[in-house]
Structure formats: structure tokens, C-alpha cells
Amino acid sequence: MSEDTNKNENVDNIPDNFDDNVSFTKLNEDVKDELALAKESLMRATADFENIKKRLEREKGEAVKFANESFARDLLPVIDALEIASNLQSGDDEIANKIKDGINLTIEQFKKCFEKYGIKEIRTDAEFNPEFHNAINYIESDEVESGKIAAVYQKGYLYNDRVLRPSMVVIAK
């Protein structure tokens, strides 16, 4: 009989608010679903943050890489003037020849400095390329193949592989 008594006690132990336990289970499932959504939202926000961080680092690197671009562009007329002075005919005048030698040394120093900071002269010994060359005229030529650069009026330069100034050229027909 003691077994029957235990069974009756277990039945008596079922709470009157058994339906509340069922609703608690439902509430627990709802909370778990909301937690899963919150975790997913956090993961997306974290991924977005990481992407923004990477983009800002990339943009910062680009800004640093091209920070001196306007300064470099401002130096181009200086080297142009020096090259024009270097090409002037000085004849047999010893002083003029020494000045010309000094100008040539200055040009070489400029070119070394340019190279050090990623400034390169645009090649003009090949076919015309509108990405790097600006055609200012066309001429008939038996010496130069059609579509090739026949003459250079102004040198062009690249800064870290970006066009700083296009070459001003004449194209052969």
C-alpha cells in the first residue's frame, strides 16, 4: 500500500497551474528564438564593422600614397624649365657651358628624387596611348609609322602609376 500512496502523492504534486508551465515552455522557446536573432544581428554588425574598418584602412593607405601628388605636380614646370635651358645652344662660351653642365646636374638630381618618390616619366617611344598621351597635332611623316608618336612637346609623368600629367605629343599619320 505504500506504493499506492506514493503514486497518489505524485499525482497530487502536479501543480494546479500546469498550463502555466506549458506557457513558460513557449516563452522559453520565444526567448531562445530572440536570442538567436540577436546573435545573428550581432554577427552581421561585426562583419559590417570589419568591412568598414578594412575600407578605411585601404582609403587611408591610398591617401598616404598620393599625399604628395599636388606637390609633385607643382614641381613639373620647374624641371620643364631646366630641360629647356639645358637644350639651349651655348656655342663655345666656356661660362655658358659650365652653367649648362650645372643645369644638367640639377636635372639629374631632380630625376633621382622623382624616382625615389615614385614619379616616372611617361614613355613616348611607342604607339600613341590616350591614357598617357595627349595628341595636340598630327603630321604626315615618312620617317615615323602611322599612329606612332612623331614628336614630344611636353613630357608627361606618372606618380605611383597614376597619370600626374599626360605627355603632349604629335602623332604621325
UniProtKB/Swiss-Prot annotation:
Q: Which domain of life is it from?
A: Bacteria
Where does the UniProt entry say this protein principally localizes? cytoplasm
Q: Which GO terms describe its cellular component?
A: cytosol
Q: Which InterPro entries match?
A: GrpE (IPR000740), GrpE_coiled_coil (IPR013805), GrpE_head (IPR009012)
Q: Name one GO molecular function term.
A: protein-folding chaperone binding
State the SUPFAM superfamilies in the record: Coiled-coil domain of nucleotide exchange factor GrpE (SSF58014), Head domain of nucleotide exchange factor GrpE (SSF51064)
Q: Name one GO biological process term.
A: protein folding
What are the UniProt keywords, alphabetically?
Answer: Chaperone, Cytoplasm, Stress response
Q: Where is it localised?
A: Cytoplasm
Q: Which family does it belong to?
A: Belongs to the GrpE family.
Role, per record: Participates actively in the response to hyperosmotic and heat shock by preventing the aggregation of stress-denatured proteins, in association with DnaK and GrpE. It is the nucleotide exchange factor for DnaK and may function as a thermosensor. Unfolded proteins bind initially to DnaJ; upon interaction with the DnaJ-bound protein, DnaK hydrolyzes its bound ATP, resulting in the formation of a stable complex. GrpE releases ADP from DnaK; ATP binding to DnaK triggers the release of the substrate protein, thus completing the reaction cycle.
What's the subunit arrangement here?
Homodimer.
Q: From the Swiss-Prot or TrEMBL record, give the protein name.
A: Protein GrpE
What gene codes for this chain? grpE
